[in-house]
Amino acid sequence: MKCIIAEKPSVARDIARIVGATHKEEGCFSGNGHVVTWAFGHLVTLAMPEAYGFPTYSRDQLPIIPEPFRLVVRQIRKGTTYMDDPSALKQLNIIRKCFDRSDRIIVATDAGREGELIFRLIYAYLDCRKPFDRLWISSLTDKAIREGLSRPADGRQYDRLYLSGKARSEADWLVGINASRALSIARGGAYSLGRVQTPTLSMICRRYIEHRDFRSVPFWKIHALPTGLSVRAIGETTYESRKAADRAMEDLDPREALIVSSVSVQTST
């Protein structure tokens, strides 16, 4: 029996149809020597600071650097605490049973760093020891899936990809948890920082401030109408006053050639 694990139910349905696993069970498909199951994104995540004995915000506890990081079922917030996501826990139990039923696993999560990490965290959390192969395809057509399943790669060939995803995940945790707690302590409130969210928010705020503070000011440019040509040449330099533009115009040598940096065409009727 082979277990194929996809990243989402829709992909699992397509794979199940192709391999002949037509019997629908809760959280999986089975048949023709295969059981096909799926994840819902990240079912397993890194534990929150509370799991390491840091339930409160304290300057003396920073930075929090877990050694090693612990894996937990995806968490949801309930009030001021976190709890296991019931849907994630239910699907993990189904995946565990699918792994137990199989002799070998085929990893069909998305072909990329995050897809690899999704499977590896599940594999580690369930303490699975079954050998696994990798379905690595860039298309989800029937032809691509069949070809990929006919020549799966040894899953261990993607160890470095997994380690890359693992490093990214742990780096996000270290930055997000420690920076959020540090700012919250310093400002006396509840603040959230992140490796991606904070720079993104900064770009939005910077653009908002630029738009808010923008003041329209007059400017001048030099225009030229070359003799015998139906074109208008516009200088690239912007002048803050008419006087400066006139002075630049007087300094032009009519014998010099113009250098064209760009051309735009406008049609009028």
Where does each model-flagged region fall?
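Amphipathic alpha-helical segments of the small helical/lid subdomains adjacent to P-loop NTPase cores
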Residues: 164-194
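Intrinsically disordered or highly flexible coil/loop and linker segments, enriched in small
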Residues: 11, 104, 154, 158, ...
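Conserved short loop/turn motifs at secondary-structure junctions
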Residues: 1-3, 109-111, 188-192, 264-269
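Short, residue-level hotspots on alpha-helical faces of the histone-fold
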Residues: 124, 173, 177, 198-202
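Intrinsically disordered, low-complexity regulatory segments
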Residues: 1-169, 173
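Hydrophobic transmembrane alpha-helix bundles
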Residues: 145, 173-177, 221-224, 228-229
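Long, highly charged, low-complexity internal segments
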Residues: 43-84, 191-269
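Long, charged, low-complexity, helical-prone intrinsically disordered regions
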Residues: 97-103, 119, 179, 243-258
